[in-house]
């Protein structure tokens, strides 16, 4: 069975990597032939969120646009299109409409509230060109929809009866605790945040309480993916470049993970993935009590949820000062991921969805 997977982003983007690419070995073992065609090249993906370079971005985007329309010349070779988010990052769903008109079914997969407009300093121009209304149309004409959490699933069910909630998962044989998890660095615990330029503002929001904690506790703040130099007065900061090659190591070199979000619908559309990655590596997490975080984390059992600066401060303080608590959360968090957020559990479900969608008229 031949499947064309379309994604706006390459594997350097977590969504393509963990919603699509990580399943390819399993799917190929079970009779699928998967071709992944991202819209952005890795080079353009690195360029697009940088400041300036407007002429270079526009010229490259037009070239990518022409290349994307070329997909339609070969669409009849495939039994199914697996659409992650969108075929083209902006504008109406012209590629998707053309695919459906050619009689090739689509399975639509989304893991963010892309039906809402989300604007940050890092994506202001790209966001202004987004067409949020297209999501409902794509959901409506897709053969099946895979939604990353129940909030997204509820939205999709307004336009389709064929919706399955499929959480974002990790390969638990790859994301696993380091052997010396209980060994403490000489400068105290490492508190880690790993994200992207579009999510860095969330960690900036908890900067004041991190500064206050640094007056009472010895720790180092590790930041990766901010997209700009990071400095918090009074807080020792290690700013580490992100790369696919060192991704697991980045999580594993943290002793406490932080996953702050705002309490809004955009955050409710998130799939808790950074919490999942930390917990898979046995890193105890403090996360905002928003959306799917409430399902992943059982407060006080396998991690902490925080709803206010005071709760963030209290719960981070407990983890910084209590090695036994960190150890308990490490074990319980890892168990949660093994049981509910491992690709070994979701891979057969995704295979069944793709196969059934291709064969259902």
Locate predicted features.
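Conserved acidic donor-binding segment of nucleotide-sugar-dependent glycosyltransferases
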Residues: 298-310, 318-324
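Acidic donor-binding loop of glycosyltransferase active sites
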Residues: 79, 143, 251-270, 283-284
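Carbohydrate-associated surface elements
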Residues: 151, 169
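Short acidic alpha-helix that forms the nucleotide-activated donor recognition element
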Residues: 137-140, 244-255, 280, 298
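Membrane-proximal helix-turn-helix segments that form the acceptor-binding/catalytic region
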Residues: 65-78, 90-108, 114-116, 125-145
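Conserved catalytic-core segment of nucleotide-activated headgroup transferases in glycan assembly
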Residues: 11-26, 36, 171-177, 182-253
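A short, well-ordered alpha-helix in the C-terminal region of glycosyltransferases
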Residues: 318, 325-340, 346-352
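Short hydrophobic beta-strand element within catalytic cores of glycosyltransferases
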Residues: 277-280, 284-287
């Amino acid at each position: 069975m031949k499947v064309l997977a379309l994604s706006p982003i390459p594997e350097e983007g977590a969504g393509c990597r963990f919603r699509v690419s990580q399943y390819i070995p399993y799917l190929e073992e079970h009779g699928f032939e998967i071709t992944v065609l991202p819209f952005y090249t890795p080079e353009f993906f690195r360029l697009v969120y940088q400041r300036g370079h407007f002429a270079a971005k526009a010229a490259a985007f037009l070239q990518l646009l022409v290349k994307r329309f070329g997909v339609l010349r070969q669409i009849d070779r495939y039994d199914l299109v697996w659409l992650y988010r969108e075929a083209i990052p902006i504008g109406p769903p012209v590629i998707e409409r053309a695919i459906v008109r050619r009689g090739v079914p689509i399975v639509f997969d989304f893991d963010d509230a892309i039906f809402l407009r989300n604007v940050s300093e890092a994506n202001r121009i790209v966001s202004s060109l987004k067409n949020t209304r297209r999501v409902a149309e794509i959901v409506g004409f897709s053969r099946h929809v895979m939604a990353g959490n129940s909030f997204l699933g509820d939205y999709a069910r307004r336009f389709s009866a064929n919706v399955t909630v499929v959480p974002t998962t990790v390969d638990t044989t790859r994301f696993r605790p380091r052997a010396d998890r209980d060994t403490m660095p000489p400068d105290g615990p490492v508190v880690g945040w790993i994200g992207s330029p579009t999510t860095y503002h969330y960690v900036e929001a908890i900067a004041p309480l991190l500064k206050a904690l640094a007056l009472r506790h010895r720790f180092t703040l590790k930041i990766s993916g901010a997209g700009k130099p990071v400095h918090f007065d009074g807080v020792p900061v290690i700013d580490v470049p992100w790369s696919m090659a060192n991704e697991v190591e980045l999580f594993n070199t943290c002793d406490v993970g932080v996953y702050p979000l705002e309490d809004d619908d955009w955050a409710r559309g998130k799939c808790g993935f950074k919490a999942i990655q930390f917990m898979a590596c046995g890193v105890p997490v403090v996360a905002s009590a928003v959306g799917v975080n409430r399902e992943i984390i059982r407060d006080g059992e396998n991690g902490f949820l925080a709803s206010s600066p005071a709760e963030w401060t209290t719960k981070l303080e407990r983890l910084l000062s209590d090695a036994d608590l960190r150890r308990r959360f490490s074990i319980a968090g890892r168990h949660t991921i093994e049981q509910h957020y491992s690709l070994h559990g979701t891979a057969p479900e995704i295979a069944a969805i793709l196969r059934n969608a291709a064969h259902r008229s």
